[in-house]
UniProtKB/Swiss-Prot annotation:
Heterodimer of LeuC and LeuD. Its cofactor is [4Fe-4S] cluster. [4Fe-4S] cluster binds at C347, C408, C411. Keywords: 4Fe-4S, Amino-acid biosynthesis, Branched-chain amino acid biosynthesis, Iron, Iron-sulfur, Leucine biosynthesis, Lyase, Metal-binding. This is 3-isopropylmalate dehydratase large subunit. Pathway: Amino-acid biosynthesis; L-leucine biosynthesis; L-leucine from 3-methyl-2-oxobutanoate: step 2/4. It comes from Haemophilus influenzae (strain ATCC 51907 / DSM 11121 / KW20 / Rd). One of its GO terms (biological process) is L-leucine biosynthetic process. The lineage of its organism: Bacteria, Pseudomonadati, Pseudomonadota, Gammaproteobacteria, Pasteurellales. Pfam families: Aconitase (PF00330). Its EC number is 4.2.1.33.
Amino acid sequence: MAKTLYEKLFDSHIVYEAEGETPILYINRHLIHEVTSPQAFDGLRVANRQVRQVNKTFGTMDHSISTQVRDVNKLEGQAKIQVLELDKNTKATGIKLFDITTKEQGIVHVMGPEQGLTLPGMTIVCGDSHTATHGAFGALAFGIGTSEVEHVLATQTLKQARAKSMKIEVRGKVASGITAKDIILAIIGKTTMAGGTGHVVEFCGEAIQDLSMEGRMTVCNMAIEMGAKAGLIAPDETTFAYLKDRPHAPKGKDWEDAVAYWKTLKSDDDAQFDTVVTLEAKDIAPQVTWGTNPGQVISVNETIPNPQEMADPVQRASAEKALHYIGLEAGTNLKDIKVDQVFIGSCTNSRIEDLRAAAAVMKGRKKADNVKRILVVPGSGLVKEQAEKEGLDKIFIAAGAEWRNPGCSMCLGMNDDRLGEWERCASTSNRNFEGRQGRNGRTHLVSPAMAAAAGVFGKFVDIRDVTLN
């Protein structure tokens, strides 16, 4: 029987399945961080349980840490408690932790692939909604809640219902200047933020295959923003080249055997998908969100839609509420919108490729007078090290940007990087919800190049009109 890639991954990890019951899956890799793990470890202690397979769980510090200092003792309040708890819990159980004193530390969804912990064919979970990032490698990866974190620590398994399969094909090649971020925002704009609900999405097509692994991670990272359980891209030579010689990747004969298996991880030609969506790559322009969910997005050269022209009453009400919060009116040209801050970072766009794209725009230019701050936050210590080796940090600093240490930073208002009230931000992160970047902050999601351009021109511009240095 023909199967989709998702079906192959799911079926190969079933530990137990019975009629009328939710299947139990084996979990190959468990990633943890300081925010969603403390209660899980507390639960283990109360029940007098041990971590079942210590060598399959890895931790990092990312969400609540400061990107300005590397000293735990200088953290305050809840952030300090969370970081110290993670350190205590990993030491007590023997779990490997990449803490803020090591260059391997980073945002969990940057650190995992970078270390070769993310491999094709795996099941990967983490107490974080953007775990779908790892699906870029042909792994079944999804976010879980704190009680499930405890369950995986205790059993290395998880109850998981079968999802539907969706195929999203992006045909042909994108135009110059169009990035993975534009592709995924255009997809969400077409499907809406609920279009993938109940599905695991496989992204395919020439435009997807042309992406680097960094770009593929950006696409899968935001699968959750269209309501999907997970996102997948079948592994290929690009995947294998990225993984070869990574610290935790197989070596020698094991590598050869692994690649031979990984090459089988693709949907069968006659596999049936529950839902199929198609986009033409040539039609995708630079994207900018105008509202308060990632599905409220248009091309930079378009005007903000009129809610009164929307047939769906729910969509209309959502748009009206979004425009009121975001402080914009229907018919406004996106290129007339000025920004107060710029954030380049997050698990969506903080890898070396993203920083290179931003630096190419900012080189030889200065922060616009109306822009209060440009934050550039690498996704890991290794990304930071590579960027500094290439001199990217000097480009950012010369332009008037702040070059920070690794962390989630202004993606979410959980640390000391936040927007002021009603400030408008061009952000490379993945969510533009109300208050996401700080109380009453206004977020517009864009690619790294578009964010950098907004920082030096003071407003949104079409990156295709910008000369790169």
